[in-house]
Amino acid sequence: MAVPKKRTSMSKKRIHKNIWKRKGWRAALKAFALAKSLSTGNSKSFFVRQLNNQTLE
C-alpha cells in the first residue's frame, strides 16, 4: 500500500477540500437549475409527459 513520504501542509489540505466542496456545489446548482427548468416547462433536454389536471373523487 502506498504511504506518503511527508505530511500534507494545511494550505494544501484546505485547497484539496475546497476543490472537493466546489464540485459538490456545482453538481447541486446544476441539479437545481434542471429541476427549475422542468417545473417551469422551459426544459429543452427532457421531454416530460403532461398529465391532465383531473380531480380525484
Curated annotation (Swiss-Prot):
The answer, when asked if Repressor is one of the entry's keywords, is no
Q: Mind telling me which GO cellular component terms the entry cites?
A: chloroplast; large ribosomal subunit
Give the GO biological process terms. translation
Which subcellular locations apply to this protein? Plastid, Chloroplast
GO MF terms listed in the record are:
structural constituent of ribosome
- Chief location of this protein within or outside the cell: plastid
Keywords, comma-separated and alphabetical: Chloroplast, Plastid, Ribonucleoprotein, Ribosomal protein
Family of the protein in this entry = Belongs to the bacterial ribosomal protein bL32 family.
The record's annotation in HAMAP family points to: Ribosomal_bL32
Q: What is this protein called?
A: Large ribosomal subunit protein bL32c
The primary gene name is: rpl32
